[in-house]
């Protein structure tokens, strides 16, 4: 089922498209949490810390792949909005072929550089081997993640956010089952958690591809489309690489933050990991709003309706503020009971809770600027402006780097936790100003005369 987001009142259209994305994102976080909870309870706190210590590296590799595939699908959304059926099929086939190339590159670099990277990040010795085992399996199976993200992005590009949700729910259930079987029954430890993630995402990717060919003929390429088109590749890379680099740059900043956290020992790492999982869960609405705005702005940019893009941004910002306030209250309420899910009874929660509270209580104050980043960044990307969001990632990196270096110099865990808020405020200001600049640039260069006339 396709969804034309160039018609109807912006807010209801956005919220209707966004709802399945929120549910899907929450399920994705739940099965990520399932890995962590099952590892923490059935393998131990050190194993939990090991998995958690690789989170920022996963953000780097998985985030890069998400960025590149999302960039490839921007052209699909724009052509769908412009009713260019042939262009849609060409963009899909070309994106798949380019993704195969990037799969080989990302896997090779990850496998070759993982051990030095873990050492560079101050990974504690008592969790190093488990961390290395977990992230190596994830890196080897990155093809499953890349192609699930790619096919889901294509479905969302034409307005279908429900089917990716269905497959994600199935994947989440499969992941939990595999976690229990591989970790508890087969005693595979962190390796079992990694394999459960890869297998479940691979199944979802296959289901998405089958659905596209059976139920979405407008997306399914024919034999003549299966080749690398030079201009198409340049266009997709011009959009995908900046988006991928934006993820990679942001991830580099979180890796610096993780390095600072690692200096405080495995208890701090385990507590921070659990707290960040809870925070990631309640902030998924912000991410879903961003994903929605990428499709919304892409389709409307393809149609040439710039006024409608601005209306959508205004509505989404207002909704995001309400969500950010609700999320801040919710995470504070859930933190203590949720933290207990990650650890067995022989772990002293009184020693774990202060680490988690410090991070969460400092972060919730800045949820509003965090929510605005997703709106501005994804709107810019949907309109084909990839460079400025990438530079927004650079601003996050600089902010995290400065705060992390100071925290390591003075030995302050609280200051290390401030890395995220500092990055959010910096990026919110940068992307907000960039959005205003781009809207003026678009109106001057691209807005259709009839649209401009109707606004006078």
Please state what every model-predicted region is.
Residues 1-18, 76-143, 185-241, 297-365, ...:
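Short alpha-helical transmembrane segments in multi-pass integral membrane proteins
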Residues 39-59, 125-130, 190-191, 232-239, ...:
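Interfacial/gating helices of multi-pass transporter permease domains
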Residues 21, 25, 37, 74, ...:
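Transmembrane alpha-helix boundary and packing residues in multipass membrane permease domains
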Residues 69, 138-156, 164-172, 193-206, ...:
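Short runs within selected transmembrane alpha-helices of multi-pass transporters and secretion channels
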Residues 26, 30-48, 118-125, 181-188, ...:
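Helix-terminus/linker motif at the lipid-water interface of multi-pass membrane proteins
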Residues 7, 11-30, 34, 57-64, ...:
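Residue-level signal for short hydrophobic patches within transmembrane helices
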Residues 16-35, 137, 171, 200-204, ...:
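Transmembrane helical elements of multi-pass membrane transporters/channels
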Residues 48-108, 145-164, 271-335, 370-392:
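Small-residue-rich hydrophobic transmembrane alpha-helices
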């Amino acid at each position: 089922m396709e969804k034309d987001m160039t018609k109807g009142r912006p807010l209801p259209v956005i919220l209707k498209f966004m709802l399945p994305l929120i549910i899907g994102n929450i399920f994705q976080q739940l099965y990520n949490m399932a890995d962590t909870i099952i590892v923490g309870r059935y393998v131990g706190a050190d194993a939990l810390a090991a998995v958690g210590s690789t989170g920022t590296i996963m953000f780097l590799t998985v985030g890069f792949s998400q960025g590149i595939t999302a960039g490839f699908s921007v052209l699909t959304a724009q052509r769908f909005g412009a009713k260019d059926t042939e262009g849609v099929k060409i963009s899909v086939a070309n994106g798949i072929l380019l993704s195969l190339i990037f799969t080989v590159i990302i896997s090779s670099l990850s496998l070759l550089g993982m051990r030095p990277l873990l050492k560079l990040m101050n990974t504690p010795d008592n969790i190093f081997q488990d961390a290395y085992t977990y992230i190596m399996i994830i890196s080897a199976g990155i093809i499953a993640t890349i192609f699930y993200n790619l096919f889901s992005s294509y479905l969302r590009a034409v307005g279908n956010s429900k089917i990716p949700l269905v497959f994600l729910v199935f994947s989440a259930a499969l992941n939990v089952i595999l976690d229990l079987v591989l970790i508890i029954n087969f005693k595979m430890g962190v390796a079992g958690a990694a394999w459960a993630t890869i297998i479940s995402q691979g199944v979802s990717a296959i289901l998405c591809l089958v659905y596209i060919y059976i139920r979405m003929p407008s997306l399914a390429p024919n034999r003549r489309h299966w080749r690398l088109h030079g201009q198409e590749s340049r266009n997709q890379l011009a959009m995908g690489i900046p988006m991928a680099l934006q993820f990679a740059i942001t991830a580099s900043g979180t890796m610096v933050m993780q390095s600072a956290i690692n200096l405080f020992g495995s208890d701090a790492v385990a507590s921070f990991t659990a707290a960040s999982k809870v925070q990631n869960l309640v902030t998924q609405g912000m991410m879903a709003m961003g994903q929605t705005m990428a499709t919304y702005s892409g389709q409307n940019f393809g149609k040439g309706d710039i006024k409608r893009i601005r209306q959508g941004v205004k509505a989404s910002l207002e909704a995001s503020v309400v969500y950010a306030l609700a999320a801040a209250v919710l995470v504070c309420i859930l933190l203590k009971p949720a933290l207990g899910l990650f650890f067995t009874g022989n772990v002293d929660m009184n020693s774990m809770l202060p680490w988690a509270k410090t991070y969460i209580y400092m972060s919730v104050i800045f949820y509003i600027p965090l929510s605005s980043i997703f709106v501005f960044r994804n709107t810019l990307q949907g309109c084909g402006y990839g460079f400025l969001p990438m530079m927004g990632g650079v601003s996050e990196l600089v902010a995290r780097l400065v705060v992390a270096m100071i925290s390591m110099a003075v030995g302050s865990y609280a200051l290390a936790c401030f890395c995220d808020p500092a990055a959010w405020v910096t990026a919110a200001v940068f992307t907000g100003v960039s959005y205003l600049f781009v809207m003026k640039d678009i109106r001057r260069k691209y807005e259709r005369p009839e649209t401009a006339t109707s606004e006078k």
